[in-house]
């Protein structure tokens, strides 16, 4: 048991999907896992362990933002021995070539957060995905026929910004989308020598506000991302 997770040792698999929304974790467990058992309800941050195609995997919500995912991911790694973590979440497109319901695989994550700078104030430490996971996820997505973009994302501490034009400049530099967690997850993976990847479904297009999705759609309909995440988790077994 850790401070924020009530599971016992052995309750959590060494491979886990991390949606931000705990209800998306519940949806994944109920619709993709067999014999799923809930291992955490603390703060309603639901976590489940079951099997997917005969492989033991877990799924747990992380909440919104880098402070929240940093708490849960660290405890999963340090207290429960998780070795592979894949974030499955949503993002807003800023690259004009990226559209709603398409996928982004976060090759690297820029950030405006001070979480990493707190440790490295003199320079910028690059947050990068595990290449093996990235490569597997890309080929699985291609085989499934899912439109998928690979590139950098911005992990932002700010959801409602007063200067959106600054973010849009990044789109012109090839940054695919804005989200709020990947940089912190990648930094934790680097610290603890584990594997991490961010897979995001585009839920909003900041270049075209008419492209959007409902809260219910974000919770339950992004199944391609969920399947790709699960298939990537078990690809090494």
UniProtKB/Swiss-Prot annotation:
The keyword Transferase applies. InterPro entries: DeoD-type, Nucleoside_phosphorylase_CS, Nucleoside_phosphorylase_d, Nucleoside_phosphorylase_sf. The keyword Glycosyltransferase applies. A purine D-ribonucleoside binds at residues 4, 179-181, 203-204. It catalyses: a purine D-ribonucleoside + phosphate = a purine nucleobase + alpha-D-ribose 1-phosphate; a purine 2'-deoxy-D-ribonucleoside + phosphate = a purine nucleobase + 2-deoxy-alpha-D-ribose 1-phosphate. Keywords: Glycosyltransferase, Transferase. Pfam families: PNP_UDP_1. The record marks 218 as: Important for catalytic activity. Phosphate binds at residues 20, 24, 43, 87-90. GO terms for molecular function: purine-nucleoside phosphorylase activity. GO terms for cellular component: cytosol. One of its GO terms (biological process) is purine nucleoside catabolic process. Its EC number is 2.4.2.1. HAMAP family: Pur_nucleosid_phosp (MF_01627). Belongs to the PNP/UDP phosphorylase family. NCBIfam families: deoD, PRK05819.1. Homohexamer; trimer of homodimers. This is Purine nucleoside phosphorylase DeoD-type. It comes from Streptococcus pyogenes serotype M4 (strain MGAS10750).
């Amino acid at each position: 048991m850790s401070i924020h997770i009530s599971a016992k040792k052995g309750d959590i698999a060494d491979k886990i999907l991390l949606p931000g929304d705990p209800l998306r974790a519940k949806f994944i467990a109920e619709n993709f896992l067999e014999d799923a058992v809930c291992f955490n309800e603390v703060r309603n941050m639901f976590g489940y362990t079951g099997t997917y195609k005969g492989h033991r995997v877990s799924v747990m919500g992380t909440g919104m933002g880098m402070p929240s995912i940093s708490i849960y991911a660290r405890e999963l790694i340090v207290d429960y021995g998780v070795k592979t973590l894949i974030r499955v979440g949503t993002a807003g497109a800023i690259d004009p070539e990226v559209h709603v319901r398409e996928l982004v695989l976060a090759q690297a994550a820029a950030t405006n957060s001070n979480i990493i700078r707190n440790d490295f104030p003199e320079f910028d430490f690059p947050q990068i995905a595990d290449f093996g996971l990235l490569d597997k996820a890309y080929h699985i997505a291609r085989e499934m026929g899912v439109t998928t973009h690979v590139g950098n994302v911005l992990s932002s501490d700010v959801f409602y910004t007063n200067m959106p034009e600054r973010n849009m400049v990044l789109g012109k530099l090839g940054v695919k989308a804005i989200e709020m967690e990947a940089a912190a997850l990648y930094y934790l993976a680097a610290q603890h020598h584990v594997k991490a990847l961010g897979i995001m479904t585009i839920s909003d297009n900041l270049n075209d506000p008419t492209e959007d999705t409902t809260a219910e759609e974000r919770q339950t309909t992004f199944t391609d991302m969920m399947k790709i995440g699960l298939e990537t988790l078990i690809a090494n077994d």
